[in-house]
Amino acid sequence: RAAYEEGVTLFDTAPAYGDGAAERLVGEALASVRDRVVIATKAPSEELAPKALKAACDRSLENLKTEHIDLYQIHWPNSKIKIEDTFAALVELRSAGKIRAFGVSNFGVKDLAPCVAQPDYLPAANQLAYNLLFRAIEYEIQPFCVKHNIAILCYSPLLHGLLSGKFLSADDVPPERARTRHFSSKRPHTRHGEPGAEAETFAAIDEIRKAARELDEPMASVSLSWLLMRPGVA
């Protein structure tokens, strides 16, 4: 609720966060201002068959204490379920008024190809990891989304706080946050088995910090401003 009081109007959650607890918290916190906010949540990847998807949507509606979901997203692709069937079910949910729009999350070009072939199935948005230090989407999926007018919603925009400027070295980062490929696989919470790029990552962070200082702006603001100017970012 404090975020709303500071001007935030889009709230994104998922049933996977705390087994529905996050949805229930969002629903309770925003109940009195529901008509002034946009609520987005996600369909679990294991529940993308039409019947299961509709049941998952109903659970989210109940958790969120709302009559409709503004943006209902597929959390991750699932190659075992025919994506056309999933999108047909999403269209039905939209027609029934249970969702206002549907989107996807973590979808690549191959995942989205069937949607382009059927205009009714084109998602409103694709939620992707994107920030100054993680720009993999720029190779293929970002241009694809721009071409097909699919908005990009960014998660990890400050890379677990690294782009806030509060950490001066890899050792300053809490272990549970030091788990991306930027960090050595020797860090306890990593799972990638790669050497990482800690020196390079923090050298880049130092340069961003210097640029922010020259602009007399917080490093987080500079990082987010850069992101907002990227093609396709909503």
Language-model segment annotations:
Residues E5, R94, Q118, P157-L158, ...:
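Conserved short secondary-structure transition element at the edge of the structured enzyme core
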Residues R1-V37:
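N-terminal binding-site loop/beta-alpha segment at the start of enzyme catalytic domains
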Residues A29-A31, A56-D58, Q118-L122, Q142-V146, ...:
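Short, hinge-like loop/turn segments at secondary-structure boundaries
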Residues E5, S45-E140, I150-A151:
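Glycine/proline-rich, positively charged
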Residues V146-A211:
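Glycine-rich, positively charged active-site loop/lid region within alpha/beta enzyme cores that binds
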